[in-house]
Amino acid sequence: MDKVKNRLVRKEFVVPFVLVTSLFFIWGFARAILDVLNKHFQMSMDITLTRSSMIQATTYIGYFLMAIPAGMFITRFGYRRGVVLGLTLFGLGSLMFIPGEGLNSFDFFLVSLFVIGCGLVVLETAANPYITELGDPATAPSRLNLAQSFNGLGSVSYTHLTLP
């Protein structure tokens, strides 16, 4: 009896799999660090706990507003372009922190976080199904579970990378 072993990821897709899986780590880290930002904004900008809760709210409003447009974009242009758009928005939102510091404006930081949230939702909307396409359909759930485990790893590791 000849057994054919299904590879989790086809050889030609190892590099894209590793790159996309690293994005799962990055967005896990990005979402988890919101709590750290919350405390720092409270201290450095002397804002209330209630006002600082806008950090999470603004980021997740980006998820709410951008999820359907992200899906439409990915349907029209494909997973890879969706990943590029998500990374572009994520990077743009992150770079907006630089002038935000000079302006010392909490509202400007909230706009930055909204753009980051939009980038994250596009990344997630593109990366999840893209991972399933990188090999045999029979092993797609295993690939997705492996990639998703890096999301949790990113969420947990932020504490070790952000401590003074």
For the regions a protein language model found, what residue spans apply to each?
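Central cavity-lining transmembrane alpha-helices of secondary-active solute carriers
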Residues: 57-71
